[in-house]
Amino acid sequence: AIKFKTDMKEAHNDLVMVLRKKGDNKSALKVCVHALKSHENDDTLHRNKGNILYALDEPEKALEAFEKALDLNPYVVDTWVNKGTVLWKGLAEREKALAAFDKALEINPNFMAAVDSRINLMAEIKANRPPFWKRIFGG
């Protein structure tokens, strides 16, 4: 039997996911913005909006969306990882990104996306750090 969802919020989220999967991020953003007009306190919609904006190469706006989602629900590990990713790869804010990944791991120490992201970020930080002697003696 076909089951219809009566909650439009879920339907909007589903449509956003389908459009993103098809690569139509602009349409997905329109749906998300429309849905937020009637569901402004839905952290999932804000997280989806952040993911879309990041895919559209708008990291500052994506960060705002993730921060709004976290204001609404600070216990969603995915949102912390997404925020960390935007800070790291979109805005080159490595220390802030590290703090976001650490927060995700504080909530769920076994969340592999957070573990992997933190490991990769630490490797990048280490690779870009000047040699020890330059940090001590300059030059």
What are these regions (language model features)?
Residues 78, 82-85:
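Alpha-helical protein-protein interaction scaffolds
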Residues 17, 51, 85-86, 120:
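Residue-level recognition of tetratricopeptide repeat
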Residues 85, 112-129:
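TPR/TPR-like alpha-solenoid helical repeat scaffolds
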Residues 13, 20, 47, 54, ...:
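Position-specific recognition of the canonical hydrophobic site in helix A of tetratricopeptide repeat
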Residues 9-10, 43-44, 77-78, 112-113:
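Helix-start (N-cap) detector for alpha-helical repeat units in TPR-like alpha-solenoids
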Residues 21-34, 55-68, 90-103, 125-137:
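Structural signature of tandem alpha-helical TPR/SEL1-like repeats
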